[in-house]
């Protein structure tokens, strides 16, 4: 493949339609009223400006809620450049609103993979009009693609063979983008990486990548695992998916869920929320699991625990929520009923073996909704081409639950940027418990919750401070 990095344009952004900015701004204002955590953090830190001097490269779904996060980081003093971490997840009016306010954003709904990796490169250049000036000193990542780019690019500077054999369309475009950048500047990745203090990572998938690199001793900077903050994983992953999964299936298909058999692959926090949502609409919910503990949890909640092989020709709706690859394979889809609905609410599109379907006939019903036709004439309905269904076919999680996640991200950025000496390069950390509890406190008033206060005697009896933390780090919520 030929080089794919494009000449830098005269404007330092790329969005679908700037005329959508007013619409986006109106929705951002509404979202702010539902995001008390971020708004409280703005108020708390407005004077002290803890992120002054921070140059944050952001790779995270470009939604209305993300716009509130971006403007919170800026309100605390940061410079920000932003791209989406998924080719289908951008809300174009949100991107336009940020650009109209002066933020460099590179994202549009339905990006090509070539554009995706071009934009991921461009968010690392903080010079005037996107020129190759100084780089970021912080990364805010979702899924780990920005972090991956720095690490893989630096490896390729020393050993080009690491980008010589792509195994997927995604890798083909990524490797071509890296080759093009190296042809322009053979040390670009090393220079950009050298300035980076740390990364804060949003998702299970991205954290897995960080932990792998840390274990191998190859992680180039400090990292905070935001995903495993209780106020992220037990809220965003569970309650967020509980609302956004069925929203996306309904928007995409208008199908009646009641009475259907729905098979959820994976019973972690995302799977739990997905299963609850489908059962709430009176589907018969089946679960597949590899972990005996999660499988027993599902069974104790009344779900039928089966294998994908068992469910393939019986279920009507399939949802992958594992963080693994090839969970729903060609042989499973070939066995499915006509018009079975197949979707993924994990981060990457390889949970469903979409590559194995490329040889078949595809019939686009509407954007992000496709019939895939098998040789016998049977069709399955594939949503968002196997990528995140709740952002590809709907607008993602509600603002309130994203306030909790993004409050964690903001606090983690402050923590790493202002206290970098407390965190070791190459290690992955979680936020301290007292900060996790702080995020929860910031959201209680909005839902009318009243917190009981310990007496001195009670605090002494259980051996905690009256102001917390209230649980040991090992406590499972």
From Swiss-Prot:
Q: Primary place of residence?
A: cytoplasm
Q: Which family does it belong to?
A: Belongs to the adenosylhomocysteinase family.
Q: What is the purpose of this protein?
A: May play a key role in the regulation of the intracellular concentration of adenosylhomocysteine.
What cofactor is needed?
NAD(+)
Q: In which pathway does it act?
A: Amino-acid biosynthesis; L-homocysteine biosynthesis; L-homocysteine from S-adenosyl-L-homocysteine: step 1/1
Q: Where does substrate bind?
A: 63, 142, 202, 232, 236
Known Pfam families for this protein?
AdoHcyase, AdoHcyase_NAD
Reaction(s) catalyzed by this protein? S-adenosyl-L-homocysteine + H2O = L-homocysteine + adenosine
Q: Fetch the Gene3D superfamilies from UniProt.
A: Adenosylhomocysteinase-like (3.40.50.1480), NAD(P)-binding Rossmann-like Domain (3.40.50.720)
Xref: HAMAP family: AdoHcyase
Q: Indicate where this protein resides in the cell.
A: Cytoplasm
Q: Can you list the GO cellular component terms from the UniProt entry?
A: cytosol
PROSITE patterns linked: ADOHCYASE_1 (PS00738), ADOHCYASE_2 (PS00739)
Name of the protein in its database record = Adenosylhomocysteinase
The cofactor note reads: Binds 1 NAD(+) per subunit.
Give me any GO biological process, just one: one-carbon metabolic process
Protein's gene: ahcY
Which GO molecular function, any one, fits this protein according to its record? adenosylhomocysteinase activity
The residues that hold NAD(+) are 203-205, 237, 266-271, 289, 324, 345-347, 390
Keywords, ordered alphabetically: Cytoplasm, Hydrolase, NAD, One-carbon metabolism
Q: Does the keyword Hydrolase apply?
A: yes
Name the top EC class: hydrolase
Q: Which SUPFAM superfamilies match?
A: Formate/glycerate dehydrogenase catalytic domain-like, NAD(P)-binding Rossmann-fold domains
